[in-house]
């Protein structure tokens, strides 16, 4: 049996008298791939925010990478989680190069400042862009990309730190059928690697 990457025990979220999520009980082990399906308003985004350690539940215990929320430095923990979704996408600087959008994830920041990146960082960023078919866009300005190209860059960024848990929030939203199929095919090839992180895809 693999190492437990994530566990929720009697987790729920309330807004006033209304329960918007839960109660939930489940766990994910290393190497597993999960898909969370549901209509709008079902609580998928709330769940993802909890899993990404960006929201605390009203009740219950959440453990991420063997660390219990409320008893750990969340900033340090977040460096071990890859997140691709609208929360991150909205804050990516449009005037940044594609390569820098991916590279800055190594410091868990958005936007290039005065960080030093070594050859390993550069090589990993370009390898990820290659995996998702956008290597040739490395020097392009992020804001000039199509929606499909941006999605591929965002997934590459989420994987830059070699995370132990990968969270994808509707990664194919806004793409046409061909773009959706191509992105999911590339991700399926990546996820087939036994060394790929435990993954939750919300759609």
Task: For each feature predicted by the language model, list its residue ranges.
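Conserved ABC transporter NBD signature motif
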Residues: 60-70, 77
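Conserved ABC ATPase signature
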Residues: 116, 141-145
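Catalytic Walker B motif of ABC-type/P-loop ATPase nucleotide-binding domains
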Residues: 166-170
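Helix-to-loop junction immediately C-terminal to a conserved catalytic motif
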Residues: 52
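Conserved structural motif at the start of ABC-family nucleotide-binding domains
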Residues: 6, 20-23, 138
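The feature captures the beta-strand-to-loop junction immediately N-terminal to the Walker
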Residues: 37-39
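Conserved catalytic motifs of ABC-family nucleotide-binding domains
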Residues: 162
């Amino acid at each position: 049996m693999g190492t437990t990457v994530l566990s929720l025990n009697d987790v729920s979220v309330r807004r006033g008298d209304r329960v918007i999520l839960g109660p939930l009980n489940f766990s994910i082990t290393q190497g597993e791939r999960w898909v969370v399906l549901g209509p709008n308003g079902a609580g998928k985004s709330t769940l993802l925010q909890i899993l990404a350690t960006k929201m605390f539940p009203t009740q219950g215990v959440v453990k991420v990478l063997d660390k219990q929320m409320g008893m750990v430095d969340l900033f340090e923990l977040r460096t071990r989680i890859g997140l691709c979704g609208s929360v991150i996408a909205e804050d990516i600087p449009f005037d940044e190069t594609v390569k820098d959008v991916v590279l800055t994830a190594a410091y868990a920041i958005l936007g290039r400042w005065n960080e030093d990146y070594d050859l390993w960082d550069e090589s990993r960023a370009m390898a990820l862009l290659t995996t998702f078919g956008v290597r040739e866009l490395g020097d392009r300005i992020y804001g000039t990309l199509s929606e499909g190209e941006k999605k591929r860059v965002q997934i590459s960024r989420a994987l830059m730190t070699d995370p132990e848990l990968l969270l994808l929030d509707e990664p194919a939203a806004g793409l046409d059928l061909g773009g959706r199929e191509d992105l999911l095919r590339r991700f399926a090839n990546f996820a087939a690697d036994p060394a790929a992180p435990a993954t939750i895809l919300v759609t």
